[in-house]
């Protein structure tokens, strides 16, 4: 079996009024009584090389065709009708601006009517077929008319060739809706899909691929055709006898990537129906995006999905002799067809960018309008396979960035966000830093978007445990079943995998918070909600969260004490490492209460560690001596074993605490003095004896009594607190006790 694609010379059909297949030309011996040697172009006008004067003028755009009525009347039903209906004197003037294919197609159709040989190629056959349909050149007027012969060329030549099918489909872009109505687009799409899905074992054909290294293609005295172009692709022909190599699974990516987005979608849809592996479908979609949206893909080509990379790396599992291709210069002997130029590259510079350029600048450089950009993004979103890991998470996030920038339909953006949530653990910080296109400049980055992605991830993690994960087609149903399957982390849905994914996402979120915390416009609520979105079990260490909190405090120095405490509540001090604790102990931006919690938690951890160590040592020693006496270290032993740096931090904290306690005692003393003065005033008031045993005096007296009792109680509580502080190792003189006054009403 072989797909022949060496039709550069213009494979065609010829006929002597009948159905004969010649050597690459389309002709008719019936010239309607007008003998001609050909057509002549003079400026913007075509003339028939004959002595008979022209009696028909056809205008198509800027071109004029000076023809004769009879050759066209005998083969075109539309021309027959238009000329009959026309009341113009000779020469009859017809304007056919709506003719599909334009002046080029009408020129070929006119030559066919005059019996001039016409070269049929993959680049002109679709326009000529549509023009023949427009002109109604059917079999009713003549056997072997233009419709029949162009259909024969399409069916027997084009559709059997991979390269010609691509070229014809590309040429149909300017022939809508004629190419659609004549099923040219559908037939070419299905032909391409069938060839792309066929197992390449034992099949040889020509296709466009990436150029091999110069050391393998630098032939003496010759220059390969693919090397004539600056493009990185080349033409692989089955007729070359050079070093053979197995065909990679992505051999067809480069060719289908030149198609317009609507035709590309038709091809991918047909390929999907035939059962192509979802990894290959995802890889070709990323390849297409790299061609038409160069700012979307990182420099260096398409990043193949994890499963796809293992498939390509493992190869097809075929022997080198079972299927091979030959790459080299294309034969030019007798070829009058279109120059292949190393591949089907009508958008050669689409995928070549130096560095990470802005998406808008790259797209503008291609001359793609915003409307077309939006159509490309929406179409790519709609054809991404539903299976997890069909495309990389990095690609999805870049596509999401472009979708937000181009104002894509909200339903498609929501669907894309769910896809990102399915594999959110594969994301990187650089991909998450998506500018806030829709928040009217409130924040530098779209934090709400990351919050939604995280919610989709958590929902996905919850459903994975209860329902089977999205499984790929079984090997018996998958295209290229012998390709080794990569480890997608896609099956099982075990708790261990889920927990590891949550831990990776937690580290990613902490890094993201550290980056966006520098934005002065970021509200505290958004920071707190994103930090608390993950469950506590997702973080075994809160160092990353502490780093993000510290960055937020640096960028927002005007936060109140309450807001700083509220911010620090998202962090668990017991999950901080020793380095983070030492940094927090000296961090003046943290509230004092948080610093004390950090130091206390670290001291508790050190005490427990020392206690466990001493307990193990005593247990080992007791077992060796035959006795077991557990040794509980006292406070002095623990403090002496504490690292010096930690003791210094704890001493500074204790000094601050003692200062606060001293100030509190001063306030209490002043309060007691005021209480004494108040009681003296009360007694003086009672001795006046102006009004006795009245409701008002009773109220005053009871009020003073209650206030006195409350004062004594608060004094007693403060005394208990200070006593507790002394027990904790703080040496202060006991507070002065207030004199006990006898309260009497006399």
UniProtKB/Swiss-Prot annotation:
Q: Where is the composition biased (Gly residues)?
A: 9-19
The UniProt entry's sequence similarity note says: Belongs to the NPH3 family.
Q: Which SUPFAM superfamilies match?
A: POZ domain
Q: Keyword annotations for this protein? A: Cell membrane, Membrane, Phosphoprotein, Transducer, Ubl conjugation pathway
Give me the disulphide-bonded residues: none
Protein species of origin: Arabidopsis thaliana
From what superkingdom does this record's organism come? Answer: Eukaryota
Supply one GO BP term: protein ubiquitination
- List every stretch annotated Disordered: 1-24, 461-500, 708-746
Job of this protein: May act as a substrate-specific adapter of an E3 ubiquitin-protein ligase complex (CUL3-RBX1-BTB) which mediates the ubiquitination and subsequent proteasomal degradation of target proteins. Signal transducer of the phototropic response and photo-induced movements. Involved in the phot1 pathway under low blue light (LBL) fluence rate and in the phot2 pathway under higher fluence rate of blue light (HBL). Necessary for root and hypocotyl phototropisms, but not for the regulation of stomata opening. Not involved in chloroplast accumulation and translocation.
InterPro entries for this protein = BTB/POZ_dom, NPH3/RPT2-like, NPH3_dom, SKP1/BTB/POZ_sf
Q: Where is the composition biased (Low complexity)?
A: 466-478
* Bilayer disposition of the protein: Peripheral membrane protein
Post-translational modification here is noted as: Phosphorylated in the dark.
Which PANTHER family would you find in this protein's record? OS12G0117600 PROTEIN (PTHR32370)
Please identify the protein, giving its name as recorded. Root phototropism protein 3
Where are the compositionally biased (Basic residues) regions? 735-746
List the GO cellular component terms: plasma membrane
Report TM segments. Answer: none
Q: Where in the cell is it found?
A: Cell membrane
């Amino acid at each position: 079996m072989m797909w022949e694609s060496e039709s550069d010379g213009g494979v065609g059909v010829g006929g002597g009024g009948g159905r004969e297949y010649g050597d690459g030309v389309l002709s008719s011996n019936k010239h309607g009584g007008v003998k001609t040697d050909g057509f002549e172009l003079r400026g913007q006008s075509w003339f028939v090389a004959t002595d008979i004067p022209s009696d028909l003028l056809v205008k198509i755009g800027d071109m004029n065709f000076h023809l004769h009525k009879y050759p066209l009347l005998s083969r075109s039903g539309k021309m027959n009708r238009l000329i009959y209906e026309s009341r113009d004197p000779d020469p009859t003037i017809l304007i056919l601006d709506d003719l599909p294919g334009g002046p080029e197609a009408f020129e070929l159709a006119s030559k066919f009517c005059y019996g001039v040989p016409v070269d049929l190629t993959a680049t002109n056959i679709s326009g000529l077929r549509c023009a023949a349909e427009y002109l109604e050149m059917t079999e009713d007027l003549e056997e072997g008319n233009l419709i029949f012969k162009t259909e024969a060329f399409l069916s027997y030549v084009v559709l059997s060739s991979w390269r010609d099918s691509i070229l014809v489909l590309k040429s149909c872009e300017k022939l809508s809706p004629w190419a659609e109505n004549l099923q040219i687009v559908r037939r070419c799409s299905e032909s391409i899909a069938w060839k792309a899905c066929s197992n390449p074992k034992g099949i040889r054909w020509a296709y466009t691929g990436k150029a091999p290294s110069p050391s393998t293609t630098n032939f003496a005295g010759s220059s390969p055709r693919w090397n004539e172009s600056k493009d990185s692709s080349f033409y692989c022909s089955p007729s070359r006898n050079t070093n053979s190599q197995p065909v990679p699974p992505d051999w067809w990516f480069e060719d289908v990537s030149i198609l317009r987005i609507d035709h590309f979608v038709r091809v991918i849809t047909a390929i999907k129906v035939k059962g192509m592996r979802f990894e290959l479908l995802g890889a070709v979609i990323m390849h297409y995006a790299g061609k038409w949206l160069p700012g979307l893909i990182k420099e260096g080509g398409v990043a193949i999905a994890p499963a796809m990379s293992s498939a390509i790396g493992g190869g097809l599992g075929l022997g080198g002799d079972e299927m091979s291709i030959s790459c080299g210069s294309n034969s030019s002997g007798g070829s009058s067809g279109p120059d292949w130029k190393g591949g089907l590259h009508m958008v050669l510079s689409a995928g070549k960018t130096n560095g990470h350029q802005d998406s808008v600048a790259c797209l503008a450089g291609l001359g793609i309008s915003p409307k077309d950009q939006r159509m490309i993004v929406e179409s790519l979103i709609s054809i991404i396979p539903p299976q997890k890991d069909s495309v990389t998470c990095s690609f999805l996030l870049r596509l999401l960035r472009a979708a937000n920038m181009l104002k894509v339909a909200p339903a498609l953006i929501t669907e894309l966000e769910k896809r990102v949530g399915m594999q959110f653990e594969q994301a990187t910080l650089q991909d998450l830093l998506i500018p806030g296109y829709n928040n009217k400049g409130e924040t530098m980055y779209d934090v709400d978007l990351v919050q939604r992605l995280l919610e989709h991830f958590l929902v996905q993690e919850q459903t994975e445990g209860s329902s089977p994960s999205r499984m790929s087609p079984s090997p018996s149903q998958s295209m290229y079943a012998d390709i080794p399957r990569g480890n997608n982390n896609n099956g099982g849905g075990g708790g261990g995998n889920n927990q590891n994914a949550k831990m990776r996402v937690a580290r990613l979120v902490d890094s993201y918070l550290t980056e966006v915390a520098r934005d002065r416009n970021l509200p505290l609520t958004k920071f707190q909600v994103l930090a608390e979105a993950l469950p506590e079990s997702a973080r075994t260490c809160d160092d990353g969260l502490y780093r993000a909190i510290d960055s937020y405090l640096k960028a927002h120095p005007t936060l109140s004490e309450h807001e700083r405490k509220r911010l620090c509540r998202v962090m668990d001090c017991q999950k901080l490492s020793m380095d983070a604790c030492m940094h927090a102990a000296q961090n003046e931006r943290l509230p004092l209460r948080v610093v004390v919690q950090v130091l206390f938690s670290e001291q508790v951890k050190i005490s427990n560690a020392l206690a466990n160590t001493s307990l193990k040592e005593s247990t080992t020693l007791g077992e060796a001596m035959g006795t077991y006496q557990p040794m509980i270290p006292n406070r002095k032993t623990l403090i002496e074993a504490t690292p010096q740096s930690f003791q210094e931090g704890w001493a500074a904290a204790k000094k601050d605490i003692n200062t606060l306690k001293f100030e509190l005692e001063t306030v209490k003393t002043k309060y007691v003095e005021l209480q004494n003065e108040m009681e003296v005033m009360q007694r003086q008031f009672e001795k006046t004896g102006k009004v006795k045993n009245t409701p008002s005096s009773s109220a005053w007296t009871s009020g003073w009594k209650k206030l006195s009792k409350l004062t004594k109680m608060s004094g007693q509580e403060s005394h208990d607190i200070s006593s507790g502080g002394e027990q904790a190792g703080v040496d202060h003189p006991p507070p002065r006790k207030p004199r006990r006054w006898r309260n009497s009403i006399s």
